[in-house]
């Protein structure tokens, strides 16, 4: 090592030691506080679902969420991918149901706060979202006529106490759906309109019960939330809330130069008072 470079090394050690832990500016502290779970507003009423806050609907929805009977082959439920002990996701790069999908399972903690659903936001109500995996051939691979028969046979009484009388299903084919296989679509098209309407109503109510359950899936407090709370209170974050220098520098980037916070701007995209230019409030 030359004399010059050893001197440089000494200077660098001295500079790094003198730096200590990186600090946040007041503006950064304000942004961090805005990202804390405690800033999550109370759940708004779901104006698309009359049963959203009916406890019996949520209870039935919870049964259906975990029931593998709610699939074509009887092997997959919502909870196959949305696992209760992993914030309702599965740690896989791509979700696997009846087949392998091309997307990652989204966590459901706090999902009822979202204005729209799926990675691409292609559903705008929680109950309509729930119907999609039920008929997706790679996920639950069922069809609405089969689900309607299943609900009547298995949960008829519980269903009727919430949603009123089930229709007469004697003329409804075992398998039929406007989105299914060729045979299922042909069976669906052959059904009288009023009968298709009745099946659609039961299918929609399945979604509404599941959505009522999903309103109860609250996000747990994380290390980040404890860190943000301590920081907002002017206290030195302690225990697992104490961030390492790398974590602090990463957070500075996240809310600063790297612009992540433009989109990832609060618990479930809801704190729109800061930064939010890409995902507008609804
Ligand atoms: C095969 C695995 C799998 C099954 C089964 C499954 N999901 Fe999902 N879920 C996913 C994947 C993957 C996504 C993202 C898919 C996309 O964006 O196209 C997702 C997205 C969602 C979302 C959107 C979350 C958000 O923040 O936008 C909700 C809500 C949801 N699922 C609920 C359900 C319900 C309810 C069921 C059962 C009726 C279910 N899922 C069944 C894998 C699954
Ligand atoms: C323009 C908006 C936008 C910006 C800026 C942005 N993200 Fe994202 N990010 C998204 C969206 C939308 C998704 C989910 C959709 C997808 O995967 O295509 C996502 C997904 C993610 C995921 C995956 C989450 C999961 O559960 O699989 C991570 C991690 C992530 N972003 C981190 C970051 C980081 C770190 C930055 C800054 C360097 C950043 N994002 C900047 C919009 C954004």
Residue ranges and their predicted role:
Residues 2-5, 18-282:
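Periplasmic c-type cytochrome electron-transfer domains
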Residues 6-15:
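Bacterial N-terminal signal peptides
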């Amino acid at each position: 090592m030359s004399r010059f470079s050893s001197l440089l090394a000494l200077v660098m050690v001295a500079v790094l030691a003198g730096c200590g832990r990186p600090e946040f500016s007041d503006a950064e502290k304000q942004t961090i506080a805005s990202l804390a779970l405690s800033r999550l507003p109370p759940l708004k009423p779901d104006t698309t679902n009359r049963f959203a806050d009916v406890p019996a609907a949520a209870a039935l929805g919870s049964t259906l969420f975990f029931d593998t009977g709610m699939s074509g082959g009887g092997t997959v439920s919502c909870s196959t991918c949305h696992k209760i002990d992993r914030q309702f996701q599965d740690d896989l790069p791509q979700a696997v149901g009846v087949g392998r999908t091309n997307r990652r399972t989204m966590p459901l903690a706090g999902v009822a706060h979202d204005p729209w659903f799926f990675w691409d936001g292609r559903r705008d109500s929680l109950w309509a979202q729930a119907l999609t995996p039920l008929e997706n051939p790679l996920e639950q691979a069922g069809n609405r006529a089969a689900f309607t028969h299943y609900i009547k046979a298995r949960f008829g009484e519980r269903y009727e106490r919430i949603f009123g009388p089930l229709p007469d299903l004697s003329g409804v084919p075992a398998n039929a759906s406007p989105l299914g296989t060729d045979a299922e679509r042909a069976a669906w098209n052959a059904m009288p309109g009023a009968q298709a309407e009745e099946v659609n109503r039961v299918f929609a109510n399945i979604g509404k019960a599941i959505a009522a359950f999903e309103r109860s899936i609250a996000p747990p407090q994380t290390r980040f939330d404890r860190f943000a709370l301590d920081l907002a209170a002017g206290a030195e974050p302690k225990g697992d809330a104490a961030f390492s220098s790398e974590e602090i520098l990463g957070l500075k980037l996240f809310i600063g130069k790297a612009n992540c916070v433009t989109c990832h701007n609060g618990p479930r995209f809801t704190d729109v008072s800061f930064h939010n230019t890409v995902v507008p409030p609804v």
